Amino acid sequence: MAMASATATLSFKTPSLSLSPPSTRCSAAQGISLTHFNKQLKSTLNLSSSSSISSSKVQPIVLKNKRISTVDSSVSTSSPSFTVFAAKGYKMKTHKASAKRFRVTGKGKIVRRRAGKQHLLAKKNTKRKNRLSKLIQVDRSDYDNVIGALPYLKVNRKV
């Protein structure tokens, strides 16, 4: 039985802003015109699951024809990016009857008991009963079925 899982990745880049020297002062009477800035910003922002928010064409904020802040292009290219991972997967359930029948050795092999040692033991000789008591390795062709029933089994397929 196969279960579905999905992974979403979002990446955000934060540009660093450097302010110009405080040679220009802003008073409460002066107004800031942001209409051109907002239109330019809306047209340059892109957001999707595979790309990051980018605003490379941002114009500086203008105060009545006076520049007070600019975007430093050399610093913004080396700005840190923050990545958010959202992974959703379903827990696989262990098949409890299979968990009682199979074991994993220290090297990662799947082993099982031999059949035929539950009843009618009086007619079986001692040598046969001893042989049936030992564990044997599961065939490689059955590994997929056992691992499907026991998803959290630590199996080494290369051994």
UniProtKB/Swiss-Prot annotation:
Assigned GO CC terms: chloroplast; large ribosomal subunit
GO MF annotations in UniProt: structural constituent of ribosome
Localization of this protein: Plastid, Chloroplast
GO BP annotations listed: translation
Entries under SUPFAM superfamilies matching the protein: L35p-like (SSF143034)
Nucleotide-binding listed as a keyword: no
Domain of life: Eukaryota
Keywords in alphabetical order: Chloroplast, Plastid, Ribonucleoprotein, Ribosomal protein, Transit peptide
Annotated Gene3D superfamilies: 4.10.410.60
Matches recorded under InterPro entries: Ribosomal_bL35, Ribosomal_bL35-like, Ribosomal_bL35_CS, Ribosomal_bL35_sf
Transit peptide: 1-86
PANTHER family reported for this sequence: 54S RIBOSOMAL PROTEIN BL35M, LARGE RIBOSOMAL SUBUNIT PROTEIN BL35M
Annotated function: Component of the chloroplast ribosome (chloro-ribosome), a dedicated translation machinery responsible for the synthesis of chloroplast genome-encoded proteins, including proteins of the transcription and translation machinery and components of the photosynthetic apparatus.
Record-stated family: Belongs to the bacterial ribosomal protein bL35 family.
Oligomeric form and interacting partners: Component of the chloroplast large ribosomal subunit (LSU). Mature 70S chloroplast ribosomes of higher plants consist of a small (30S) and a large (50S) subunit. The 30S small subunit contains 1 molecule of ribosomal RNA (16S rRNA) and 24 different proteins. The 50S large subunit contains 3 rRNA molecules (23S, 5S and 4.5S rRNA) and 33 different proteins.
Protein name (record): Large ribosomal subunit protein bL35c
Organism per entry: Spinacia oleracea (Spinach)
Gene field: RPL35
